[in-house]
Regions:
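Short beta-strand scaffold positions
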Residues: 85, 220-221, 239
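A charged, aromatic-enriched C-terminal amphipathic alpha-helix characteristic of glycosyltransferases
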Residues: 240-247, 254-290
Length: 290
């Protein structure tokens, strides 16, 4: 790793274009280590720059074994003029941990920009899951009535499971396949929501943005940080179990599906155009300049 002087020289190069009093958006973590991040922030302070910290993930909450580092992260966040947090739940958690920044903005949703023509989703009673079965092993035993298609290499499969594996595909291919019709499943690493680690209810899922960008409705667990947004805009269904998820798909009519798809179509335009990122960044700049 760099010595203090080497790191300082490297940061001077990275920050060469930052002028006195500029607004700087700093996305954390950089995964370069806390020493790097703190040194970067200290140099910004010398330039009297306005610092907006865009909190993507919080390592001490992501990894319980790192929780002892929480005070150091809070101290780093507290040097910001404004912070952007993924969710209201994360805001409340960080405030409880000692966050004192007055200007806190909530991201709520990831965008999913793309530039390719997609299919018009057709009614199909099936669920998609985009994610590695290695990380979500309980899905390999899916035995509900609704078929589940998983975009992941096949693991040792359970012959009783109602699952098919689609392998890894590129991002454009994934959007094209999803857009043919069906519903996208967002779920945590545990089958039973009561066993789910707290973090999954604090951050925001990239999966929900992927499915919605593809134009298909989503089924999400009630503990998901933006479940209320999905319910409020009628973009799919909020459930408390996988059994309930399957039951909803089995009882869904073609008319209900198409009505939901129409709502998703309007919403997906925002994700395609990067609306959520643009809005929260513009709002953050306005906050620190006002």
């Amino acid at each position: 790793s760099d010595s203090q002087s080497e790191m300082s020289t490297r940061l001077d190069g990275i920050m060469a274009s930052v002028g006195y009093g500029d607004v700087v958006i700093y996305q954390l973590p950089t995964w370069n280590g806390r020493e790097f991040d703190q040194a970067f922030i200290s140099k910004l302070k010398i330039l009297q720059a306005k610092l907006v910290t865009f909190i993507h993930d919080v390592p001490p909450l992501m990894f319980p074994s790192n929780y002892y580092l929480m005070p150091e992260y809070i101290d780093m966040y507290n040097q910001s003029d404004a912070v952007i947090v993924p969710s209201e739940q994360m805001r409340d958690k960080l405030l409880a941990e000692g966050l004192t920044v007055d200007k806190i903005l909530v991201q709520s949703m990831w965008d999913h920009p793309y530039d390719l023509p997609l299919h018009q989703p057709q009614f199909a009673r099936k669920l998609y899951f985009a994610g590695s079965v290695e990380r979500f092993p309980h899905l390999s035993n899916w035995s509900y009535a609704t078929p589940l298609e998983i975009f992941s290499p096949e693991e040792e499969s359970n012959p009783e499971a109602n699952v098919s594996y689609r392998g890894w595909v590129s991002r454009p291919e994934l959007l094209l396949e999803l857009s043919k019709g069906g519903l996208g499943l967002v779920w945590g690493v545990e089958e039973n929501p009561a066993d789910e680690p707290e973090y999954y209810g604090l951050n925001i899922s990239h999966k929900s943005a992927t499915y919605l960008a593809a134009g298909i409705p989503v089924i999400v667990p009630s503990y998901l940080s933006n479940a209320e947004l999905i319910r409020e805009h009628g973009l799919g269904f909020v459930v408390d179990s996988l059994e309930e998820a399957s039951r909803i798909v089995e009882s869904l009519t073609a008319e209900e599906y198409q009505a939901t798809v129409e709502r998703v179509r309007k919403f997906s335009f925002l994700l395609k155009e990067g609306y959520f990122s643009k809005k929260v960044l513009v709002d953050a700049v306005m906050e620190v300049l006002s």
